[in-house]
Amino acid sequence: HGSMWDKTGKKNHFYDAKGELGLSKMAYHFIAGVLHSADALCSIWNPSVNSYKRINAPVTSSGATWSPNSIAYGGNNRSTMVRIPDTGRVELRLMDGAANPYLLQAGILVAGLDGIANKRDPGKRIDLNLYAEGHKVKGLRKLPLNLLDAIRLTEKSKVLRDGFGDSFVKSYVKLKHSQWDDYAGSLSQWERDNTLDC
């Protein structure tokens, strides 16, 4: 959960009593920045091969995965990537426990501040259950299917290169490519069981 306060800690810049769902224009620009760069930030927020098994998990018997698989925001909607649970704050639901906590926070700031600086528009909120009805939403962007797709998006992102610095992005992408290559070069039990007789 996050909000943005002034230096005194007394004014929440994300709160506006007259704003939709109690959020300010600044908060919506921040959300839009996070949505804009979410796919490129996946390699940082979801840095392991197994992260993408969580993101793209099938719906459980409860009707949810508790992990978003598309790039969207909504009110008190646990099927969206960004949730607005109450006035003056947002919940970012994409990140997993494998993320470096410092890079995770830096990524939020890079993307959110880019949204504010460029007055990005998040579009209309989605109130549908995206697990059950996501196919009905036209133009809904999906999150990367695997770590390699995420790495490639990180590498191409101007927002991340500007925010983190080109040298960091190059080094990070090189490290993640090395990890992906190591994974791709290993033979899993599933492959042994299902493909060795091909």
Regions found by a protein language model. Give the residues of each.
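Active-site capping/gating regions of soluble enzymes
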Residues: H1-I126, A132-L140
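Acidic, glycine-enriched catalytic cores built around paired aspartates
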Residues: L130-C198
